[in-house]
C-alpha cells in the first residue's frame, strides 16, 4: 500500500474494501470460511489494518475522518459476518431437519416390547391357582437361623441337610435358607389355626451347576392347618392344582420321607413318556405342631412344596435349567 495516498484515495480504497468484503462474506459456504474472511479483513494484519497504515501522512484534521470511516466499516463488516453466521446456522439446522423428517405415511417397523421372565410368570401362575383355592401369600427372610430352617421343622442335628456341603452357612447360627418352609413356622407363630398359606421365594443349596441343578433356585410351598384334615384333603388339593397347571397329564403319588411330615409322598407327572417328580408333600408331623403350641389332637395339617424351575421347564419343554439364568434375549424373547 502506497504511503502517499491522499484523503480522497483512502476513502476510495475503504469503499472498494467494503464492496469486496461484502461480496466474499455473502458467498461464504461455511463458518470456517467466515472465520478466514474475518481474519483477512479485520485481523491485526488484515486488509483494513494495512490500509489504515496510510493515515500517517494525513493532516491532523484528515486523520479523524478516516478513523471514523474505518470504524463504521469495521462495524458494518462485523454485522455482515454475524448475519451470515446466523444464516449458515439456520441452513445447517434445516438440512438436519430434512434428513430427520419422519414419513408418517411409512409402515411402522414395530416396537420391541419387554417380556416378563418365564420364572416370574410361572411363579405368578402357581400362586394364582392357590389363591383361587382360598390360600394367602406369606413371605419371609432369605437369611435364616438354624431354629427356623431346621430345628422347628423336626430336622435333627445329624441330618444330612445340615451338612456344610449342602447348606450355605454365614457364621454363627445364620445361614441361607434351604427351603421356604421357615416361612410356615413364622406364620404359625403369629397366627392361630385355621391357616392356609402359600410361600414363594428364593432358596439356596450347595448344588453343582448342571442341566437340572443350581445353587440358587425358587420354591413355592403350601401349608394348611385346620381341624380334621387328612391325606385325602392333601391329595385332592395337589391333584386339583396339578391338573389346573399341567392339564390332563397322568399323576401318581409315591411314598417318601421328609422329617417334618408323616406320612410323606412324592408326586410325579408323566412327561414325554417318563415319570417326572414335581412335588413333595405330606401330613404335618404332630411334633412340629407341638413345638409351635398347637394341639395335634385338635388340629392336623398338610404341606407341599415344588421347584418353580422344574414346573417352568416342564411347561415350556426346556431341557436345561441354565437357560433360565443366562439372560440370553434370543431365548427369553420366546416367552
Curated annotation (Swiss-Prot):
This is Phenylalanine--tRNA ligase alpha subunit. Pfam families: Phe_tRNA-synt_N, tRNA-synt_2d. The lineage of its organism: Bacteria, Bacillati, Cyanobacteriota, Cyanophyceae, Synechococcales. Its cofactor is Mg(2+). It is found in: Cytoplasm. Its EC number is 6.1.1.20. One of its GO terms (molecular function) is ATP binding. One of its GO terms (cellular component) is cytoplasm. Keywords: Aminoacyl-tRNA synthetase, ATP-binding, Cytoplasm, Ligase, Magnesium, Metal-binding, Nucleotide-binding, Protein biosynthesis. Its main location: cytoplasm. GO terms for biological process: phenylalanyl-tRNA aminoacylation. Binds 2 magnesium ions per tetramer. It comes from Prochlorococcus marinus (strain NATL2A). It catalyses: tRNA(Phe) + L-phenylalanine + ATP = L-phenylalanyl-tRNA(Phe) + AMP + diphosphate + H(+). The keyword Lyase does not apply. Mg(2+) binds at residue 262. It comes from the Bacteria. Belongs to the class-II aminoacyl-tRNA synthetase family. Phe-tRNA synthetase alpha subunit type 1 subfamily. Tetramer of two alpha and two beta subunits. The keyword Ligase applies. CDD domains: PheRS_alpha_core. It is an enzyme of class 6 (ligase). HAMAP family: Phe_tRNA_synth_alpha1.
Amino acid at each position: 500500500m502506497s504511503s502517499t495516498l491522499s484523503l480522497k484515495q483512502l476513502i476510495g480504497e475503504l469503499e472498494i474494501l467494503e464492496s469486496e468484503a461484502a461480496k466474499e462474506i455473502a458467498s461464504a459456504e461455511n463458518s470456517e470460511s467466515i472465520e478466514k474472511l474475518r481474519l483477512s479483513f479485520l485481523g491485526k494484519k488484515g486488509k483494513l489494518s494495512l490500509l489504515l497504515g496510510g493515515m500517517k501522512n494525513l493532516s491532523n484534521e484528515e486523520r479523524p475522518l478516516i478513523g471514523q470511516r474505518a470504524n463504521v466499516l469495521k462495524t458494518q463488516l462485523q454485522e455482515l459476518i454475524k448475519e451470515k453466521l446466523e444464516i449458515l446456522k439456520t441452513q445447517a439446522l434445516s438440512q438436519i431437519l430434512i434428513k430427520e423428517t419422519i414419513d408418517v405415511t411409512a409402515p411402522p417397523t414395530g416396537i420391541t416390547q419387554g417380556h416378563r421372565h418365564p420364572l416370574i410368570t410361572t411363579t405368578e401362575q402357581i400362586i394364582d391357582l392357590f389363591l383361587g383355592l382360598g390360600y394367602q401369600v406369606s413371605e419371609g427372610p432369605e437369611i435364616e437361623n438354624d431354629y427356623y430352617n431346621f430345628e422347628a421343622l423336626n430336622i435333627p442335628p445329624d441330618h444330612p441337610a445340615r451338612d456344610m456341603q449342602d447348606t450355605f452357612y454365614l457364621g454363627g447360627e445364620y445361614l441361607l435358607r434351604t427351603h421356604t418352609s421357615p416361612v410356615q413356622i413364622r406364620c404359625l407363630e403369629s397366627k392361630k389355626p385355621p391357616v392356609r398359606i402359600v410361600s414363594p421365594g428364593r432358596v439356596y443349596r450347595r448344588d453343582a451347576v448342571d442341566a437340572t441343578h443350581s445353587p440358587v433356585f425358587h420354591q413355592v410351598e403350601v401349608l394348611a392347618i385346620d381341624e380334621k384334615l387328612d391325606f385325602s384333603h392333601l391329595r385332592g388339593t395337589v391333584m386339583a392344582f396339578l391338573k389346573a397347571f399341567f392339564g390332563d397329564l397322568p399323576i401318581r403319588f409315591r411314598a417318601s420321607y421328609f422329617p417334618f411330615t408323616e406320612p410323606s409322598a412324592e408326586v410325579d407327572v408323566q412327561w414325554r413318556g417318563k415319570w417326572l417328580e414335581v412335588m413333595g408333600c405330606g401330613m404335618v408331623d404332630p411334633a412340629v405342631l407341638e413345638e409351635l403350641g398347637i394341639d395335634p389332637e385338635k388340629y392336623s395339617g398338610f404341606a407341599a412344596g415344588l421347584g418353580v424351575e422344574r414346573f417352568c421347564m416342564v411347561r415350556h419343554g426346556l431341557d436345561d435349567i441354565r437357560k433360565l439364568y443366562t439372560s440370553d434375549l434370543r431365548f427369553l424373547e420366546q416367552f
